[in-house]
Structures are given as C-alpha cells and as structure tokens.
Amino acid sequence: APALYGIIGAYRKGHILFVSADESGFLDVGTPNTQLTWMNVQINGRPVTPRNGHPVEIEALWYNTLALAHHIALQRKDPDPCSAKELAAMRTVFRKRFLLPDGSLRDVWRSEEDGGPDNSVRPNQLFAAALPFPVLEPEKAEGVVKIAREKLLTPFGLRTLSPDDPAFCPDYAGSPAERGRSYHQGTVWPWLLGVYADALFKTTEAVSAGKRTVMSGVVTDFLNTISPLFTRHLSESCLGHISEIFSGTEPWAPHGSIAKAWSEAGVYRAL
C-alpha cells in the first residue's frame, strides 16, 4: 500500500515527465510531439496518432488506481488518498468529457485551446468498461461495448480505428513509413480481445443481473466470432502461435511478428 500511495503522489506532484494532474484529478499526458500511450508510432519525429491530452484508457486506468487506493486505505484505516466524494466527482467529469451522443467515448479529450477533442472510434474506450472499478454506469458501458462490437470487432481481434473514419488504413504494407502510418490506423490487434472480453462479460453480467441464459448466449456469440483465429490462423503463419497484427479488412492477412506474446496473452485471457 505505501508503494501505491507513493506512486499516486508522484503523479499528482508532477514528478513524472510529461504528466501532470489537472484540477479534476485526471492526468494530462504528453505534448504534441510525444507519444506516451501504446499507440506510439512516430515518423520523422512526428506522432502518427497524436494522443496528448487526456487519452481515454489512461484516465480509466488512473481512476481505477485511485479507486483501488481508496479501497485499500479503508481496509487498512490509512489516510485516504482519494475519497468516495472525489471519485464520484471524477466519474461526473469523465462522462462530461468523453461520452458522445452515439454511446461511444472520445479517444482523447482536450480543451479547445489545446486543439480540441479527438472523437475517433478506437478500442481504447473499452478500458472504461473493462476495469474492476467502473468509471461508467453499466448502461453507458453497454453502449461502449456495442460500438466496439459493431465497428471494431473482427474474427482476429479488434481494429485500431473504425472503417468509417476517413483515416482508416487497413493494409500493413510498403516501406517502414507506410507501415507505420497504418500500424494503429485500422490494423487488427489480437491482444485487444482480452480487454473486449472483460468489458463484454462485465457489462452483460451487470445489465442482465447475471442471468445465466443471457451470459451463455453472449459467450457463445463471442467464441463463434473469433473461431477463425483458432480454426484457421494457428496453422497458417507460425504453427500454434498468434501473429502480432492482421489487416483491417478481409481476408485478414497476418502481419508483424509471427508469434507475439501479447497477442497470445490477450487471447488466452479472453478465453
């Protein structure tokens, strides 16, 4: 617990390079020239997917860190690093900043003076529905999962960008710069299946009050969707292993590393 409290304090005091806490308690991350999230490609020193400001998954993870610390502090009778009242206020801020009319979440929130928000439909929003301490109510989290299922889910993982987006680039091919431009702009990543499954099952259980028939149907549909990952892919690239990425459209060609640890870990977690 002391280590966790110390980490929180370091972020709040601005001791982490390019990271600071704002007046709402959330984290302001990076600059226009830095890439501090997993979507980290730069070409000639410029980010391909600029995500400075308030990336949705960073804020969801940070909220969970504070909520966990609050839970531990209550159990240990320690000074509370983030009270229940503060957490409730953060949930309100999160909804106001990120929730869009169609039920999806912004990928990045920024103030207008900092360039304005990024409303791209990406899988990062699933972290807000998947983590143990929910920053969204189940009904709103259900909308996030619905958008991901309709726009991002494929038989081999989740797209990094909706095909409806003008910047969608599904083919990972060409020069290093050309591949870099598509790496997080539409290619499919299997590791995201773990996050999707967490969000799907957690949300379905909450909304359906744990009804076994509903849960069984959701699990069956999910497994049917991703079955080609096992019936086809495990014998087409590196025998018995899962590739790093796939094309964002059919025929879902595998690319990148032919046996990727995080792909396999994410898929195994989903199962």
Q: Residue ranges of each PLM-predicted region?
A:
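Substrate-binding groove/exosite segments of carbohydrate-active enzymes
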Residues: 54-57, 122-129, 178-191, 197, ...
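Generic long, charged, amphipathic alpha-helical segments
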Residues: 158-193
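Acidic/His metal-coordination segments adjacent to aromatic residues that form catalytic metal sites
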Residues: 32-54, 111-113, 172-183, 244-254
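Catalytic cores of carbohydrate-active enzymes
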Residues: 9-12, 16-23, 28, 61-172, ...
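Acidic, serine/threonine/proline-rich low-complexity intrinsically disordered regions
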Residues: 74-81, 142, 199-220
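Short, contiguous acidic/charged loop-to-helix segments that flank catalytic cores in large enzymes
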Residues: 116, 179-188, 201-214, 254-259
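Aromatic-rich carbohydrate-recognition surfaces in CAZymes
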Residues: 1-41, 55-59, 63, 189-203, ...
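Amphipathic, non-membrane alpha-helical segments in soluble helical-bundle scaffolds
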Residues: 1, 52-59, 80, 84, ...
